Amino acid sequence: MKFQLVTHFQPAGDQPQAIDSLVAGLNDNKRDQVLLGVTGSGKTFTMANVIARTNRPALIIAHNKTLAAQLYEEMKGFFPHNAVEYFISYYDYYQPEAYLPQTDTYIEKDSVINERIDMLRYSAVCSLLERRDTIVVASVSCIYGLGSPESYLSMTITLSTGDRIRINDFLNDLANLQYKRSDIRFERGYFRMRGDVIDIFPAYYEDKAWRLLLIGNEIEGISEINAITGNIIKCIDKITIFPNSYHITSRETLLRAVQPIREELNERLDYYYSQNKIVEAQRLEQRTNFDIEMMVATGTCKGIENYSRYLYGMEAGDAPPTLFEYLPEDVILFVDESHVTVPQIGAMYNGNESRKKKLIDHGFRLPSAFDNRPLKFKEWESMRPQTIYISATPGKYELARTNNLFVEQVIRPTGITDPICIVKPAEAQVYDVVHEAQVTIKRGFCVLITTLTKKMAEKLAEHMSELNMKVSYLHSDISALERIDIVYKLRSKEIDVLIGVNLLREGLDIPECGLVAILDADKEGFLRSETSLIQTIGRAARNAESRAILYADKVTGSMDRALKETERRRKKQKKYSVLHNVLPKTIIKPISNTLKEKVVVKVTTIGMNKDTVSSLRKQMLAHAKNLEFEEAAKIKNIIGRINNL
């Protein structure tokens, strides 16, 4: 099936030449290209046109979940008849398995999985395996181990109307795919049998399931049903049932893996005993033997991914199978906001290796567990397909790959120029930013404010709230879907002011924004670097009446370069508008939120529980993020006790 771009717009501004240049580069087999596209110039629309023109599948990597969600929404709008999928980390809370030698504390892996995102991940994998017209929008989590596509595909079951099956064998096959049987509980990853009817709820459907109608051993009919009501949606001729776990393999392969696991265990035990490390030896022997027993009995075990070397026939040090293994050969890779995303990809491996080493050294895991990891940067480089890096401020790596050549997209189709930048003294910045925000809100626009610290963001939000202003703030403890919901509320005028630290830079797409305020702009550093300032100023470039205010008592080198680059772009944009008689027009973008989280509130007997648990959960997430696993585990236990009251 071809990619069908659905839009009322035609490429304009710099878009036509950018699309032509990028398509030509792909056709000329250029491995790397850079699109230097300013905020609001329609980079996503350019990507969509490149995909449609080349008719090639695509993987788009974003550096955070909020930006990935925006890209997913936009791509679904552009390609409603094709498979647009979403692949980010499915953890609302994640505490990896860890050992702290200082306190002799072992912390078991613990996580809270977001079921909706888990379903979307399965859907992405299945679309890549079943159809060519697929676009996957992913976060950097796509470089983490996922399971072998060969093993995954080999375990699929395809059924057609008229097929004859042995019912008991088929039910066993479903169990081998990690589907669970329950006549009462029917949700993703479950199946049930009632008389001559078998219902199967695939892992990659949210509210639909399949129904097999049997006459004897023959499949008389296959239906797609509403998973809640059981009502038939439509009749279908054929289905493919994919496994309910990525880390799955045939029973024969699994049994073959047992012997080399035992051999590695014996080698490691010999090492520990030679070093007189009796505790470590006993710990490893007990744990590994238990895992082997579970794998033989049930086909899986807790932490089975740590045995991936043997399950997938890998050699020591081989790159783990990831989402990249599932991609078609002619896929196009778009790295959005590449100046942030590329360094993120490079940083993932080191943190994982440090944690694993402690587990292995102290007898909690075999050395082969090292192979359950994210890709190293060099591995990612070697396997990535033709790549287009996209950023308003490309990094050194991207430009080095293209010999400093890039396709520039500075002219916006809307005629909007980069915003006027005003520098004001930082001394009275809080008083002034409140006043400027009130003026902007009266004009019918919303406000973005960026601070240097989370504490300052919270205090400013509290101060504005006391002045009866509708305000919220973004920070790293807020989940991906909650962030999306906050941005949705800002656009729909449920709130007027959004305050954040480092979350208001790349990719936040809010045409209703009439003011971007940067507090302490003269504090030189990562958050106030030239790149950060240009990106933050760019948040005001989707509205013809928007401004940017930088609060500073002096003009730093970063400020000077950012202001000069912004002015250079403004002059070029104004010249184009005059030459082509273009009047600046604010972007009109539908307000949608298809990823809005479905919130279920648990009523407890103590009125304070909701707020208390919310506060504790934020602390738990912060400790886990800072690798303070012992503290995170303590707080998790407290939350559990409160919820049981």
From Swiss-Prot:
Name this protein carries in UniProt: UvrABC system protein B
GO CC, alphabetical: cytoplasm; excinuclease repair complex
HAMAP family named among the record's database cross-references: UvrB (MF_00204)
Lineage: Bacteria, Pseudomonadati, Pseudomonadota, Alphaproteobacteria, Rickettsiales
Name of the gene encoding the protein in the UniProt record: uvrB
Domain Helicase ATP-binding positions: 24-414
Similarity section: Belongs to the UvrB family.
Function, in words: The UvrABC repair system catalyzes the recognition and processing of DNA lesions. A damage recognition complex composed of 2 UvrA and 2 UvrB subunits scans DNA for abnormalities. Upon binding of the UvrA(2)B(2) complex to a putative damaged site, the DNA wraps around one UvrB monomer. DNA wrap is dependent on ATP binding by UvrB and probably causes local melting of the DNA helix, facilitating insertion of UvrB beta-hairpin between the DNA strands. Then UvrB probes one DNA strand for the presence of a lesion.
Record note on quaternary structure: Forms a heterotetramer with UvrA during the search for lesions. Interacts with UvrC in an incision complex.
Organism this protein belongs to: Wolbachia sp. subsp. Brugia malayi (strain TRS)
Principal localisation: cytoplasm
Superkingdom in the source lineage: Bacteria
Pfam families linked to this entry: Helicase_C (PF00271), ResIII (PF04851), UVR (PF02151), UvrB (PF12344), UvrB_inter (PF17757)
UniProtKB keywords: ATP-binding, Cytoplasm, DNA damage, DNA excision, DNA repair, Excision nuclease, Nucleotide-binding, SOS response
Localization per record: Cytoplasm
GO molecular function: ATP binding; ATP hydrolysis activity; DNA binding; excinuclease ABC activity
